[in-house]
Regions:
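Metal-centered catalytic cores of metalloenzymes
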Residues: 1-50, 65, 74
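A metal-dependent hydrolase metal-coordination microenvironment
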Residues: 24, 47-200
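Exposed alpha-helical structural elements
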Residues: 15, 31, 152-155, 204
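Conserved acidic, metal-coordinating active-site core of Asp-based
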Residues: 199-209
């Protein structure tokens, strides 16, 4: 009987962990609250010898190979005893509020940022931090307290999204032409793979596969 109860508890935890990656925000929030309420504090306490941390996480709002949402990342950090975590999705701030809230519930100190790529004309002939791409620099913004950008800078995020969508569709057009008759549709095959309509090149690969 004890074994059966333990197995049922494990199955319920596994179900809730899957729900953390639902595209429905309410489902994610309910799942996290349930998991936190059943967590064993002593099993998720950071080690006294070393502080575990990961300050460069990507959620499914840009791309995460395991499909982790911001809430799922925070829960994973709690399970592994992380004291500090940071989210830095590409070109979007969609996961900021959820991540900071989830970290608060999980007892983790969280920070939120954004990662993008810029071209620096002055270094057009030199590699900066993107191997094989002279002039291209991965650029970070850190310390966001909300995903709601002020009106005076909100157009920057809009422009990042526009550029990403144009880049994706150019890639898709070229790959479709090369792989024809194996083709995919941006609206029908790619966008549904994202929770908020911000696909990356990796989503294109997933759609083809």
């Amino acid at each position: 009987m004890v074994k059966d109860n333990a197995q049922k508890a494990e199955e319920e935890m596994a179900k809730l962990e899957l729900e953390l990656n639902s595209f429905d925000p309410a489902t994610r929030a309910d799942a996290l609250d349930s998991l936190i309420s059943h967590a064993q504090p002593e099993s998720t306490r950071p080690s006294a010898e070393a502080v575990a941390l990961n300050m460069h996480c990507h959620s499914f709002f840009s791309f995460n190979a395991f499909g982790h949402s911001p809430s799922s990342l925070a829960w994973l950090g709690k399970k592994r005893g992380f004291a500090l975590m940071g989210i830095v999705d590409f070109d979007v701030l969609d996961g900021v509020d959820e991540f900071l809230s989830a970290c608060g519930k999980a007892g983790i100190r969280g920070t939120a940022g954004i990662e993008t790529r810029v071209f620096v004309p002055e270094y057009a002939a030199q590699e900066i931090n993107s191997p094989g791409e002279p002039g291209v620099c991965y650029h970070m913004g850190i310390g966001f307290s909300s995903g709601r950008a002020p009106e005076n800078v909100a157009p920057i995020l809009t422009d990042l999204g526009r550029r990403a969508a144009e880049r994706n569709q150019q890639i898709l057009s070229r790959v479709n032409a090369y792989l024809d008759p194996v083709t995919i549709d941006y609206e029908g095959d790619v966008l549904p793979l994202t929770p908020a309509g911000h696909p990356t090149e990796r989503h294109l690969v997933a759609a083809y596969i």
